[in-house]
Swiss-Prot record:
Belongs to the class I-like SAM-binding methyltransferase superfamily. rRNA adenine N(6)-methyltransferase family. This protein produces a dimethylation of the adenine residue at position 2085 in 23S rRNA, resulting in reduced affinity between ribosomes and macrolide-lincosamide-streptogramin B antibiotics. It comes from Streptomyces fradiae (Streptomyces roseoflavus). S-adenosyl-L-methionine binds at N66, L68, G93, E114, D141, N157. The gene is ermSF. This is rRNA adenine N-6-methyltransferase. Pfam families: RrnaAD. Its EC number is 2.1.1.184.
Amino acid sequence: MARAPRSPHPARSRETSRAHPPYGTRADRAPGRGRDRDRSPDSPGNTSSRDGGRSPDRARRELSQNFLARRAVAERVARLVRPAPGGLLLEVGAGRGVLTEALAPYCGRLVAHEIDPRLLPALRDRFGGPHHAHVRISGGDFLAAPVPREPFALAGNIPYSRTAGIVDWALRARTLTSATFVTQLEYARKRTGDYGRWSLLTVRTWPRHEWRLLGRVSRREFRPVPRVDSGILRIERRERPLLPSAALGDYHRMVELGFSGVGGSLYASLRRAHRAGPLDAAFRAARLDRSVVVAYVTPEQWLTVFRTLRPVRSRPAGR
């Protein structure tokens, strides 16, 4: 994970909420931005014996802790979350509580998760009074938390390095209504088609989840200043899925075949499982050229292709 450079300016407020150095799965990580760079034994301040030999600065970097410098940004994010009035809201990565404070008026109950044990006492002190009786601070790894049985919204200024795991958790949660994350801008743009290209994850989950980019947050809003800007990513679980549950397995198999890259085009990949006539008809219905590369096919075009092809049985292997 890339080390965030130090800001040339002092932070505007001590009340801060977390943002994070660049996100990096093995597939999406830019060269030289790996987590191991932050874990070098030559990192400054590594001689402290606290926290198992980690200095507070090193622990902060390993937990992807960069903090929002202005409360106004947290309030902007909170307005975009829009949880159900009186409903349950979970926050992942409470940090020092700035976003928590901004979210609290918008929900009936708020459970704020924070993995860093050093931040928990201050959080519990800040939200322990009667004004925040509906707020509960939860320590530990959010990814180990059980999914609520009741409908809930999810929000957070999440670690770039843990974005994939947190997003997967949200997508698997059957009672989720929406998730609103501040995360790496590149990731948010990639997942929402903002580059004009669409990812496998977005297309695969589109029948049940809508992905949107709600805005961006400048890197200058964080202290220390990270290398990249952040985006506000919104994932909404559809009240009425675009496909019936019985069709999802076939849809997922078609999408995975299409993203296999065999033949260099979506048509060539799908031709392995479908006859030319029905496939040509599906491409005409979706207004797709046979030479189109899979990344440039929108989720709605995928659905048109699938709905046109679904009555057609796949060819047996080898034919």
